[in-house]
């Protein structure tokens, strides 16, 4: 029997079950479904902005935007020697973006895209998919602005899928699968907005709000 066609709706159903897709490589057409025993998450009130990163944010001449060029952000995340983003995954996330369930946050130097992150939203959960950096600290800046936005929008779960040393240094932790599924169930029971009404994120405010919550 042929497996069901992979569609954005099927992808959202998988996220609701705590499963996410990956390919072995850019050229591998097969999609693998992942449900790790241990899951990386960012507690939204424990993101760590170091003094040096705070100075970088306050003094930066970069511009931060959201959903300005989702496809370019995903392409930039895939622009590395090894990537799990194959053409099928790229297409699916672009379609999810068109449906309002996938979002990007971009960091620009002038008109040049120098950093960013993208992910999927469902209920009060944000599933971080990938990020990239073409300037020192650009991905850290993207995360700082992203977490500030998630807090303001009412999100309660930021799923990073896996825990890396880079994410751990910024406050991410690893939890057991059972704990993750409980948090996911709670997050799916509510609603949040990636573009909350009246939200404004200038650099000084992002640093100040983080210091009040972390």
Curated annotation (Swiss-Prot):
Subcellular localization: Cytoplasm
GO cellular component term, pick one: cytoplasm
Main location as per UniProt: cytoplasm
TM region positions: none
Gene3D superfamilies: Leucyl/phenylalanyl-tRNA-protein transferase, C-terminal domain
UniProt key word Nucleotide-binding: no
Matches recorded under SUPFAM superfamilies: Acyl-CoA N-acyltransferases (Nat) (SSF55729)
E.C. no: 2.3.2.6
Molecular functions (GO terms): leucyl-tRNA--protein transferase activity
Domain of life according to the entry: Bacteria
Catalyzed reactions per annotation: N-terminal L-lysyl-[protein] + L-leucyl-tRNA(Leu) = N-terminal L-leucyl-L-lysyl-[protein] + tRNA(Leu) + H(+); N-terminal L-arginyl-[protein] + L-leucyl-tRNA(Leu) = N-terminal L-leucyl-L-arginyl-[protein] + tRNA(Leu) + H(+); L-phenylalanyl-tRNA(Phe) + an N-terminal L-alpha-aminoacyl-[protein] = an N-terminal L-phenylalanyl-L-alpha-aminoacyl-[protein] + tRNA(Phe)
First-tier enzyme category under EC: transferase
GO biological process: protein catabolic process
Entry keywords, A to Z: Acyltransferase, Cytoplasm, Transferase
Family the entry assigns: Belongs to the L/F-transferase family.
PANTHER family in alphabetical order: LEUCYL/PHENYLALANYL-TRNA--PROTEIN TRANSFERASE, LEUCYL_PHENYLALANYL-TRNA--PROTEIN TRANSFERASE
Function according to Swiss-Prot or TrEMBL: Functions in the N-end rule pathway of protein degradation where it conjugates Leu, Phe and, less efficiently, Met from aminoacyl-tRNAs to the N-termini of proteins containing an N-terminal arginine or lysine.
Name recorded for this polypeptide: Leucyl/phenylalanyl-tRNA--protein transferase
Organism from which the protein derives: Cereibacter sphaeroides (strain KD131 / KCTC 12085) (Rhodobacter sphaeroides)
Gene: aat
